[in-house]
Amino acid sequence: MALNIENIIAEIKEATILELNDLVKAIEEEFGVTAAAPVAVAAAGGAAEEAKDSFDVELTSAGDKKVGVIKVVREITGLGLKEAKELVDGAPAMVKEGVATAEAEEIKAKLEEAGASVTLK
């Protein structure tokens, strides 16, 4: 029995919607397939929440040990004493912008150890 593609197509053209629906269901059952179009799965969290590779380190509060926080800010930023004090006194303020994840975590840990409150953005 040879398949004649043109005859099959002609038969499909003349079939009703209900007959074509039954045909699709029969093919799905017979071959264990589905006629549903493949759907692209969105990345977890969507594109807006992709894993960030750089962060801004923001000093939200200097806490009780302002002198220690100023020393750490000077060490991290290379600012002079006056500039570092102004940054700490002006909290919330950006300490560093666009730093790598590991460096941002390290800076956050140093500042928190000195008594500051820090957020990564």
From Swiss-Prot:
Assigned keywords, A-Z: Ribonucleoprotein, Ribosomal protein
Instruction: Note whether Repeat occurs among the keywords.
Output: no
Output one GO BP term. Answer: translation
One GO CC annotation, please? Answer: cytosolic large ribosomal subunit
- InterPro entries per the UniProt record, alphabetical: Ribosomal_bL12, Ribosomal_bL12_C, Ribosomal_bL12_C/ClpS-like, Ribosomal_bL12_oligo, Ribosomal_bL12_oligo_N_sf
GO terms of molecular function: mRNA binding; structural constituent of ribosome
Which top-rank group of organisms is this from?
Bacteria
Keyword Ribonucleoprotein assigned = yes
Q: Which family does it belong to?
A: Belongs to the bacterial ribosomal protein bL12 family.
Subunit structure as annotated in this protein's UniProt entry: Homodimer. Part of the ribosomal stalk of the 50S ribosomal subunit. Forms a multimeric L10(L12)X complex, where L10 forms an elongated spine to which 2 to 4 L12 dimers bind in a sequential fashion. Binds GTP-bound translation factors.
The function of this protein is: Forms part of the ribosomal stalk which helps the ribosome interact with GTP-bound translation factors. Is thus essential for accurate translation.
Q: What is this protein called?
A: Large ribosomal subunit protein bL12
